[in-house]
Amino acid sequence: MYYNKIRWEKGVITIEKINKKLRAERLKRNLTYEDMANLLGYKSRSTYMYIERGFTEPRLEVMKKIATIFNKPVSYFFNLKV
């Protein structure tokens, strides 16, 4: 079983579940990869695209920014009950 640096626990949360939520929230707001990259201060749309597609693991600071853009708590993306 593959675990990334955060050591996701099997069956609790996976990077794929986070990615699906990121994509769903972005599409719900009719935002493109380029829009998200601009909102996050990235020069290239591929930087955000790599996060959403799971090629790059997002840092907590990035997840906080994304949560703010989507008006969601960070815990929403991790299925945490706070």
Short names for language-model regions:
Residues 2-28:
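A short, Lys/Arg-rich alpha-helix, primarily the initiator
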Residues 20, 30-31, 43, 58-61:
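Residue-level signal for the short linker/turn that defines the boundary of a DNA-recognition helix
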Residues 23, 34, 64:
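Residues within the helices of the helix-turn-helix
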Residues 26, 37, 67:
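The alpha-helix within a helix-turn-helix
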Residues 27, 41, 52-55, 82:
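Residue-level detection of the helix-turn-helix DNA-binding "recognition helix"
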Residues 30-50:
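Short alpha-helical DNA-recognition segment
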Residues 47-50, 62, 76:
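Residue-level recognition of specific faces of alpha-helices
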Residues 60, 68-82:
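Short C-terminal boundary/hinge segments that cap the last helix of small helical domains
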